[in-house]
Amino acid sequence: MKLSIFFVLFFIAIAYCQPEFLDDEEDEVEETLPVAEEGREKSCITWRNSCMHYDKGCCFPWTCVCWSQTVSRNSSRKEKKCQCRLR
């Protein structure tokens, strides 16, 4: 009799506590997910010399955008800059 009461209480405790364990796991996943996304975004938004060959291509939905820019105010020399950006 005592053993059956023990098992009943044991199963009630498991059923009562189990949702808390699941919620904790979901919270842990939500906490680590932004860190992974942030790392991915940093690797997607990188400066490059050209958009050709896409060795380290832009991550979707980012696209490679290039433009020419003068090196300094008094210089006529232009430099090509490329960067992954959202369009």
Swiss-Prot record:
Keywords: Calcium channel impairing toxin, Disulfide bond, Ion channel impairing toxin, Knottin, Neurotoxin, Secreted, Signal, Toxin, Voltage-gated calcium channel impairing toxin
Compartment(s) where it occurs, according to its Swiss-Prot or TrEMBL record: Secreted
UniProt-recorded Gene Ontology molecular function terms: calcium channel regulator activity; toxin activity
GO cellular component, one term: extracellular region
Keyword Signal assigned: yes
Highest taxon, organism lineage: Eukaryota
Key word Protein transport present: no
Disulfide bonds: 44-59, 51-64, 58-84, 66-82
Tissue: Expressed by the venom gland.
Propeptide: 18-40
Record's signal peptide: 1-17
Other observations noted: According to the nomenclature proposed by King and colleagues (2008), 'Gsp(267)' comes from the species name 'Geolycosa sp (strain A267TDLS2-KZARNA)'. This species has been reclassified since that study, as indicated in the work of Oparin and colleagues (2016).
Domain description: The presence of a 'disulfide through disulfide knot' structurally defines this protein as a knottin.
Family from the record: Belongs to the neurotoxin omega-lctx family.
Function: Modulates Cav2.1/CACNA1A voltage-gated calcium channels (P/Q-type currents) in rat cerebellar Purkinje cells and hippocampal CA1-CA3 neurons. At saturating concentrations (>10 nM) decelerates activation kinetics and slightly increases peak amplitude without affecting deactivation kinetics. In vivo, does not cause death when intravenously injected into mice. In rat models, through its activity on Cav2.1/CACNA1A, has an ameliorative effect on memory defects provoked by hyperstimulation of N-methyl-D-aspartate receptors (NMDARs) in the hippocampus.
Protein name: Omega-lycotoxin-Am1g
Species this chain originates from: Alopecosa marikovskyi
